């Protein structure tokens, strides 16, 4: 996805197709492992139609930050499913707030809500730094999309999550 070209009416399909291409094998592997761990239980919980809508929304909405920031930069391009995967992960966290997550590179169990807060803080900070080749705006946009999606389609889930965490 090239925001500069998209803003000028060119290569519009890349808004979607870029979500099916990854920079390298570790990028693809990490996204697909995350999807494999969190996608099936979430799909079972919300149903296939809403799951597909969540994934598609995460993919599309997560590009907005990149678009806003990079639409005047002809050299910027981004790809990968990380925004959609972040949407799935954060919807999962709302539905299973008492679960623990274990990062592959840091094998320490982390409570899901704590992971979510740390992830949001880190991606927000990293998006402001722009020091690496990771699209932190897409990660942040996807995570927020997942949270908003649950609020829109199952607002009672937040009350259940709070009760589970505090109860």
Give the location of each predicted region.
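A detector for small-residue-rich transmembrane helices and their helix-helix packing motifs
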Residues: 1-167
